[in-house]
Amino acid sequence: MSLLDWFANRRKTEPVVHDYQEREIADGLWTKCESCDALTYTKDLQANLMVCLQCGHHLRIYSDERIRQLIDPGTWQFLDEAVSPTDPLGFRDRKSYSDRLKETQANTGLSDAVRTGVGLLEGQPVALGVMDFRFMGGSMGSVVGEKLTRLIEKGTEQRSPVIIVCASGGARMQEGMLSLMQMAKISGALERHREAGLLYLPILTHPTTGGVTASFAMLGDLIIAEPKALIGFAGRRVIEQTLREKLPDDFQTAEYLQAHGFVDTIVPRTQLKKTLAQLIRLHQPQSPEMKLPLLESSSPATAPL
């Protein structure tokens, strides 16, 4: 038996004894980045608003966290939390729509896929809607349409800016035409808001697709997106099969849409609140007291013909 064989045989027959005691790591203590696989202490990640400290990837967050990040502490008031969906079509796939709703509500603690309310953003009143992808992929049904319409009307009534954080797979198929109607319903409320001379800012997060993209997500005075967010209408595979050609690797990303004029600006999550506050201040109507000073000139007020 060679020395190499002896060591190999010893390795098989004798267990390796470690001189340290394995420690159990508590669940949730560390978080793995979906993009670069880096492990980050969860508290550090939360302090950076769930943006990877290594590669800048924006991890998915949900409505409660989004509201905490954008609204000043102690100023948030929910609107229409009791509004809940029904099953007008008696829809059934693998299970009934009613059962699916009950199960999702129990798992998420949400009544539907959007939460709305009013609060202060750096001291400025705003009407805010936040879509939550946990609830059936953030799909837009009649309750989402109703809550967002009421939110916009509240903003118009109070003459405050409206901000909607979009995260959705599109219209909810279980509600059929009733879900598609919400596209026009929300768009109509936004048009009345615009006619009143008021600001609307949609924030497109990962993912924003389908009927949401085809309606209120693209109707803002300024369209904002988070970095690398998937934004589109139909899915990539559907488009490739229809066109019979390969699409660019960055197709339907926030960066691709900005390069082609569909998105105005891409704002990292860590700068979002500050950017929104600046935009709101810039769009505030000028008060009568804030008249611009007249430029002094030695030339006569009227020039001879």
From Swiss-Prot:
A Pfam family (short name) is Carboxyl_trans
Specify the protein name. Acetyl-coenzyme A carboxylase carboxyl transferase subunit beta
Annotated CoA carboxyltransferase N-terminal domain ranges read 29-298
* HAMAP family per UniProt: AcetylCoA_CT_beta
Q: State the reactions this protein catalyses.
A: N(6)-carboxybiotinyl-L-lysyl-[protein] + acetyl-CoA = N(6)-biotinyl-L-lysyl-[protein] + malonyl-CoA
Q: Name one GO cellular component term.
A: acetyl-CoA carboxylase complex
UniProt organism field: Synechococcus elongatus (strain ATCC 33912 / PCC 7942 / FACHB-805) (Anacystis nidulans R2)
UniProt family annotation:
Belongs to the AccD/PCCB family.
Task: Report whether Metal-binding shows up as a keyword of the record.
Answer: yes
Chain positions of all zinc fingers (C4-type): 33-55
**Which cofactors are named for this entry?**
Zn(2+)
Relate the assembly described in the record.
Acetyl-CoA carboxylase is a heterohexamer composed of biotin carboxyl carrier protein (AccB), biotin carboxylase (AccC) and two subunits each of ACCase subunit alpha (AccA) and ACCase subunit beta (AccD).
